[in-house]
Amino acid sequence: MSTKALKKKQHINVQHVNSSSDEGSEKKVVVVVNSVKPKFSMLNLSDEDDDKSDQDENEDKKDSESEESEEEEEEEEIEKEKPQAKEQLSSKQQKQKQQQQASKKKQAKKKQQQKKKQQQQEKDELELNEIEKSSPPIILSEIEIKDKEFRELFKINTVNLNPDNELKKLFGCKSSDIKGQKKKSVHHFKKKNYIFVQPKPEWPDVMGGFMVMEICNDDKVPSSPTNATTTTTTTTTTTNTVSPKLKSQQQSLDGINYFKIKWGQTYSNIQEEFYLALTTHDPMSLVEIIRYHPYHIDSLLQLGQVCLQTADYSKAGDFVEMAVFAFENVFHHLFNPLNGNCRFEYRHDQNKSCFLAIFRFIQIIGRRACHRTALELCKILLTWDYSDPLYVRLIIDYYSIRSKQYRFLVDLFTKLKTITPTNQGDLSLLPNFCYSAALAMYHLEREKSTTTTSTSTSTSSSKSSSVEESSDILLQKALISFPMVLQPLLEKLKTNFSIPKNGKIITLENDPFFKDDPLEKRIDHLVTLFVERNYQCWQTPEILDWLKSNVIIVLDKVAAKHPMVKQLSDSIKAEYETVNQEVFDHLVLSEYSDVINRLTPDIIEAMHAEGFRDILPQRDPNQAPPQHLRRGGIGQGFQIHQRNQQQQRRVQQQLRQLQQQQQQNLQHQQQQPLEPLLQENPDYTGPANPVLNFLHSLLPWNDPSIQRERQLAATQGTQQPAPGFLDDYVDFSDEDENEN
């Protein structure tokens, strides 16, 4: 389109906007156009020029008329496009209105739901208030109060249960195999999130049916009468539609479930084979069980201990992890080991192997420097069984200090004062807790002194310090209660405390107070366990200086006959007076420390020669696991080797038959008399001298073939002439003549 046409189009649009499109205005416009003088009249030109100008005007008129016709066509097109644009705008506006209406409806629904929730909460609060008014006040016992404090203190974080996260913090992802392990797709273990152990791709497949976890609430402790009254009142006052808040509170009154493992017949038979294998004292018999039943827990744990004695730590860890994985695959759907409401008691015989698998797993993880994960597993074992049958109290202090959970250890020692709510043994009667709690408080005090705190934190710390005892006092009480710990601890650290006194050098640990044992070696086993496990936590120079200063203070108090010395020593003597040393003898040192009784190299070489090197059960790579067997359970290793079982039995039978034949041949040879190496020929009639015998054998008539012919002739009755000297003579000259 030309510039003139665009200008005229703009002019027309302006006229439309001003609403001056009537006929009168058009006439006026025409008049105005006609009244305008020609442009060339102002130049005073001649008539010819006027004629030319008239021609030019006519041409201009024609051009203008053609342009006007084009403009009219364009206007018509624009007018046609206007309703389409209006329709598009109207559709967009309708969509926007619909969206606004939908958003308003959603907001209204949300407001209604919020109002309903508020009304329901108000109703619940009113009902709870009525229940509290109508029911007698609930008086919590000391055990229930301790149970609440215990659950708050022993909360378990699932993030800390993964040892890979701790290894990442220590070494990074590049320096470990974690990054490569995650890339491997374990398709037959992928459908379930595991808590303790993530299975490896080379492990055998699993299946269910060999053992099951079931609820055994018959062993549950009966609820108190207060709980019974509260539950009855809630059921009578509430309607049929009970709110979820009331349901949760009703369940929290008595929400503890007891679980136990139940073996199937096949697993019981495998267990009998395991007991028979133990009587042989041959680890290869256990390997034979694992080959056909790769998830038998007791066999896996026993082989793990054998691998530790042969210094094969990787295989020991694999065996223990497989045992934990087998236990985790039979979890009940209500069994949640992290809530603290599930009990898995050790007193049931079929629970012991699974309980022991978690305990051995703690040792394996602790040797890998995953101390925080080991601490969380210790908490789980204590929540499963309050009686602490495996003496987790002897190792939980070590993992608390190594994982820098000082506040947890101090609160456990000073607030709870017992390892579990139902356990009556005070933690101040254990040497490991007395010394470890003092060390944890020492680290907390150092953290407070080094960090700059705000006013709020300083006030809170002053309140806590007024209630809690300082690290110096805790350590002095530990030294007074258990003075026999100092000397073996310093010997393990390869140091001594010596000070100059009266011109002489005196060693503090050789003082009679620390050297003499008032308990008469009743707790020597506990002292040895503590020293072998925790000596690494005391080897820094700052801690040794702190220990030395408190040893000097204790000796001064002993010399001054401070009343605290007599009070603490009398309480310890009264506690351990009736305890024999045999009580702690079953606590094996290797179970509670890194000390392992290893086998001699010649025994290890003999075991490797017998095939003890490659004993881990492997998954069959040629056979894919069936889809319905990928969701959990144990024992599919039996199906893996089931197709090869008959062949192996045939091979074994053939070997037995060969062995029996060899034994029979040996017996037959032993029964027969031995034949002499040189036997005399009875038919020989020659001289006895060996030289003459040799010359005699060279004679032609003593040829054995001739003698045989004579024997044949004698038997047939025919007589042959006696051999002559020229019998074998050949005349070659006659043969030459015949040829010629």
Swiss-Prot record:
Biased composition regions of type Basic residues, renumbered to the chain: 1-11, 103-118
Locations of Acidic residues compositional bias? Answer: 46-58, 65-78, 728-740
Give the start-end ranges of region Disordered.
1-130, 221-243, 640-672, 711-740
The record's InterPro entries line, in alphabetical order, gives: TCF25/Rqc1
> Which residues lie in Low complexity bias regions?
30-41, 86-102, 226-241, 641-672
Q: Name one Pfam family in it.
A: Tcf25
Q: Which residues form a coiled coil?
A: 54-134, 639-672
Q: Does the keyword DNA repair apply?
A: no
Which key words are in the record? Coiled coil, Cytoplasm, DNA-binding, Nucleus, Repressor, Transcription, Transcription regulation
Q: Which GO terms describe its molecular function?
A: DNA binding; transcription corepressor activity
Note whether DNA-binding occurs among the keywords: yes
Give the subcellular location: Nucleus; Cytoplasm, Cytosol
An example GO BP is:
sorocarp stalk cell differentiation
Q: Name one GO cellular component term.
A: cytosol
Q: Where is this protein primarily located?
A: nucleus
**Quaternary structure and partners:** Component of the ribosome quality control complex (RQC).
Protein purpose: Component of the ribosome quality control complex (RQC), a ribosome-associated complex that mediates ubiquitination and extraction of incompletely synthesized nascent chains for proteasomal degradation.
The Swiss-Prot or TrEMBL record describes its family as follows:
Belongs to the TCF25 family.
| Stated name of the protein | Ribosome quality control complex subunit TCF25
Q: Which gene encodes it?
A: tcf25
